[in-house]
């Protein structure tokens, strides 16, 4: 059993066949000048040419295909006996496999046997094959799948079995091929049934006892969720169950998926559009290499190409990392039972099992994130954090961040107060460094911004005294805490720190306590709506009344003397007429004529109203008008009454809500100005900076998931002075990524401020040839003569004068 030999007589037979089909002899003649073989010589190096010929006429060249197929079958039998042969020994088989896989759709019967042979060999001898041979077989199967010649589910099952082979390149190829097939099914075919089958297969593989197979299925599910192939609650919960896997690496992968933030500002919308814009404005690696291939190779150009390649790879990596941090908020919100999940995960944290500190920190972070988003009650979590709240603790700023994220308005104030006391006693003391004090006050501020009910007057006033501390960072952190409670509950502050009230009623305002939500009985901002529009709508509705009202008003109108100037009597007459009609309906049929006459007499008596009654009605109308006028004046003076009246008396339209939103934004800007005026006439730029930053943070929390960021905890207003070594290290690190050379920026984008001359050099010549020809025609005879003289002098090697 030595090396695999080529099929006997293969080349000669092919030559004869092809020559016969073309009606020519392909044997090289003695008078051949070039001495090259014919273009139809079917040796191992031109199987690609044979493949193109067979694609044009599969039936005529079926014999050549069968010849290669028989050679493949015989070689596979040998490979079953000796699977460990190298790539050099099996090169002919690899070429034959790629040849047959490209023509499989033209010969379905043979392709079925071909794919079965590949599946059988990979399942039985996959681990013992040469890596390159194994990779070639997998690529052939992927090609067959793309041609719909094999079942994708069977192929994926085979790929998951091959994941256990210790071949890093193969694993990467298998996972990428599965993701590519998902993308193809989702975007091109829109086959929901096939997506469901693949999803069920991946979910079953995540429960596999082999950790490497479970991890591969986990990576496929995470990638499909991020790329919106399987963005549903079922996928998110299956990934969440991997947080309790026995292998720590699988746990960390799932927890990283849930913990990755969308971005620092919480905005993940239009990320695909931003990525596409970035791709349009930057050159691809293929464009860079193509332009470099067609120019003279110099040292400068080689450096530029290397720099461009580094920049492109860096942007690809940044894009991949940005995609990996998406969708965590949606995944957390999709959990079926977040309370049970947090209790189980926190139980694993509290267990005596010795986990790595990084793994334990990931579990604490995930618990805090889910507690904060879902407003859960896991009170033992806060007391568990007490042991880690020490300035010398490893990653203490992250633990402070998790404590702030886990606090929300539904946590009992006494629990949060204990947490704040621990932070204040361990961090905000004179025996600690200014950095530790700053971090502690920042953490307390973030906790109290989520749980303002936990603040006590004593603690808050003690922390406010640090506004005059000698260190700038500590004093600014204390001022930011004061600024927060000026907007939340200024009564807890000392009188000198409260500032001026923003509104007239702020001094008498009652601030809600714990579990007492503030209920609005009107739409805030509805006072700006115009009442005339509402009156017009009501009048229009009154005109379009019901049929019954119209019928009643039309009864016996001939017998009633109408008066246009007296609206009230007319209304009373109509009510009287309605009563008479009802009485007519109740009369007996026998005495109908007599009772009709009597009722007509009674009706005439009731209609005749005396002058005294008319005067009384007029006085009542005037009194009602005066009362309504006074009430309208009171409503105009009090915006709350006007807003309440507009909210109750009209039906809001989309235009009304748009006007209210614009008014609220304007009012918010005015409120910020009033907040700055609270500082007094002698306010500093630092105070204004605190106010602006606090407003940005509050707006950020309202617009995103509402959780604190690590930059809020580690925020220092005045950075520590760096040493010379640190500054030089920053300089050297920046030079590797610099986009500037000799003071000029690198022009990589499509629109980066090039001049018209530079842009004209890149235009296609067909676009500018007419312009150049016209420019030459417009030149004077003197200019043409001068140009010709300079040209002739340059041609002769002389310098033009």
Swiss-Prot record:
One of its GO terms (cellular component) is nucleolus. Residues 24-40 have a biased composition (Polar residues). It comes from the Eukaryota. InterPro entries: ARM-type_fold, Sda1, SDA1_C, SDA1_MD, SDA1_N. Pfam families: SDA1_C (PF21638), SDA1_dom (PF05285), SDA1_HEAT (PF08158). Keywords: Developmental protein, Differentiation, Gonadal differentiation, Nucleus, Protein transport, Ribosome biogenesis, Transport. GO terms for biological process: cell differentiation; gonadal mesoderm development; protein transport; ribosomal large subunit biogenesis; ribosomal large subunit export from nucleus. Changing residue 48 to E: In ar226; confers a recessive temperature-sensitive Pro phenotype in which an ectopic mass of proliferating germ cells occupies the proximal adult germ line. Its main location: nucleus. Disruption phenotype: Worms exhibit defects in hermaphrodite gonadogenesis and germline proliferation which are associated with a reduction in sheath cell number. It is found in: Nucleus. Residues 770-779, 787-801 have a biased composition (Basic residues). Residues 1-40, 495-517, 536-647, 739-801 are annotated as: Disordered. Residues 544-568, 583-633 have a biased composition (Acidic residues). Required for 60S pre-ribosomal subunits export to the cytoplasm. Required for normal somatic gonad development and for regulation of germline development and proliferation. Belongs to the SDA1 family. This is Protein SDA1 homolog.
